Amino acid sequence: TKAATEEPTQSAEQDATQETAETREITDMAGRKVTVPTAENIESVFSAGPVAAIFLYMVAPDKLLGWNYELNDVEKSIILDKYQDLPNFGMGDSINYEAVIAADPTIAVNVGTINDKMISDCDKLSKSLGVPVVAVDGDLSASAEAYRFMGELLGEEEQAEKLASYAEKTFADIEKMEVPEDKKVRIYYGNGEDSLET
């Protein structure tokens, strides 16, 4: 009888140890405490939006669950063939939650401006999908830090460091530039299918 009572306790302890070994608590870039699988146990990642998808494609393309819209010909020309036909899960109010859940991502990543709305969106998305959602700072000036954070999260530190170093060098080069006011140009950066969204 004693052995019978000890066995479940030991089994429970083993389960707890195994669970701890397979997960970790991190602080994401919004300051949220999130329990996520260890890097080797993250098999696929849902991107909450296009910026997150691009980050994932650059850092860990094989873990990218899919895109957030149909890629156009220009985008396909610079994206490797094997990733062009990943499913389109939508974004924002148009996310196909059933399709995402069926695809069974390990975690989700949301890249954008860190504010109360983003934090709320991450929490809501986590409840809807039933997986941890990690917030990443999408500010351009935080690019290097974001790459390194993603690399550590996904176990792709070497690739992330290459991207982070490139970002830091680029910003350093820009800081050194001295362009006279009359030589500076104004640029329109458009988004959307017709480049008419800002």
Go through each PLM region and give its residues.
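Short beta-strand->loop
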Residues: 67-68, 90-92, 109-113, 135-138, ...
